[in-house]
């Protein structure tokens, strides 16, 4: 049992989360994320996971949130085919997933049998300039989403590219390009905030206990800044304290979050 306590934002308020896991043998785990928000109420997630060498299967019931939209997943089953190399010596690997469940928007009451599946091709991390300090990660893929509420099937190509640079033992920076379209008109949960995103970050490791990070997100289609997030994390002996401030340029919205994560209990 590892508790997490904090203040999320003005819509959710103060929260407490307790995560519980219990093995049911070598390959099966039952788990629960018990989440309570002072404004949103009790939003738990219960699940069962079966793990094999090549794949895993997850069954879940519970609530998930994204951009203030609460979605309840009922009888949600997900199959993940784990990342595998195509052939020995070839720096390419592939992965895939299928997910299906009855989803419900808590605010609108709208329900839909949501089915989503995707496949991805990943390149092994590329180290540039004969140095481990500069790295490039590349992924391409395809996603499909079927919604019973609209009897629709939408798809999108997916392109991810991230270039990372370790400037010094204390400084890291990165820039990423992300391309993905909306595949659901019923839910905004787990959908991209924008179709074409340029993201860059800077991290300063002050010492073994303090880390400061800035992440900026830019909308390439609208040619405007989308969001900037500032975070500071301090490690204590048994728990971590995180202060997070987010400013959304698109609607001039500000959000502040405080997190206490217990790492030894």
Language-model features: where?
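Flexible loop and strand-edge segments within Gram-negative outer membrane beta-barrel domains
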Residues: 39-49, 55-83, 97-105, 110, ...
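Transmembrane beta-strand segments of Gram-negative outer membrane beta-barrel proteins
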Residues: 1-12, 28-31, 56-59, 92-98, ...
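Conserved short loop/turn motifs at secondary-structure junctions
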Residues: 33-38, 62-67, 216-220, 247
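Outer-membrane beta-barrel initiation region
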Residues: 1-51, 262
């Amino acid at each position: 049992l590892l508790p997490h306590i904090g203040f999320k934002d003005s819509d959710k308020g103060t929260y407490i989360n307790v995560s519980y896991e219990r093995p049911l043998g070598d390959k099966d785990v039952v788990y629960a994320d018990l989440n309570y928000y002072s404004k949103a109420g009790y939003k738990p997630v219960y699940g069962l996971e079966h793990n094999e060498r090549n794949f895993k299967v997850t069954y879940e019931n519970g609530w998930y949130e994204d951009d203030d939209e609460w979605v309840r997943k009922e009888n949600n089953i997900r199959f993940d085919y784990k990342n595998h190399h195509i052939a020995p010596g070839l720096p390419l690997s592939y992965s895939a997933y299928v997910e299906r469940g009855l989803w419900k928007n808590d605010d609108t009451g709208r329900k839909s049998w949501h089915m989503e599946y995707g496949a991805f091709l990943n390149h092994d991390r590329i180290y540039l300039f004969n140095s481990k300090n500069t790295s490039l990660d590349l992924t391409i893929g395809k996603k499909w989403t079927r919604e019973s509420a609209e009897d629709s099937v939408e798809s999108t190509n997916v392109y991810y590219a991230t270039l990372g640079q370790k400037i010094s033992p204390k400084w890291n920076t990165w820039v990423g390009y992300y391309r993905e379209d909306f595949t659901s008109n019923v839910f905004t949960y787990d959908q991209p905030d924008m179709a074409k995103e340029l993201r860059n970050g800077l991290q300063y490791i002050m010492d073994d206990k303090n880390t400061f990070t800035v992440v900026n997100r830019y909308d390439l289609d609208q040619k405007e800044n989308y969001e900037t997030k500032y975070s500071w994390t301090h490690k204590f002996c048994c728990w971590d304290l995180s202060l997070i401030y987010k400013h959304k340029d698109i609607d001039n919205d500000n959000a502040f979050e405080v997190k206490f994560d217990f790492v030894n209990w």
